[in-house]
Amino acid sequence: GFFALIPKIISSPLFKTLLSAVGSALSSSGEQE
């Protein structure tokens, strides 16, 4: 099912890029406050 795809999604380079982008966005927004 869907949960079987999760490890593949997490290990994908695109997910890592997206995750790092979200993380940097959150940290930058936190610094602005």
From Swiss-Prot:
GO terms for biological process: monoatomic ion transport. Exhibits unusual shark repellent and surfactant properties. Forms voltage-dependent, ion-permeable channels in membranes. At high concentration causes cell membrane lysis. Causes death in killfish oryzias latipes in 30 minutes at a concentration of 25 micrograms/ml. Keywords: Ion transport, Membrane, Secreted, Target cell membrane, Target membrane, Toxin, Transmembrane, Transport. Belongs to the pardaxin family. InterPro entries: Pardaxin. One of its GO terms (molecular function) is toxin activity. This is Pardaxin P-1. It is found in: Secreted; Target cell membrane. The lineage of its organism: Eukaryota, Metazoa, Chordata, Craniata, Vertebrata. GO terms for cellular component: extracellular region; membrane; other organism cell membrane. It comes from the Eukaryota. Consists of a C-terminal hydrophilic region and a predominantly hydrophobic remainder.
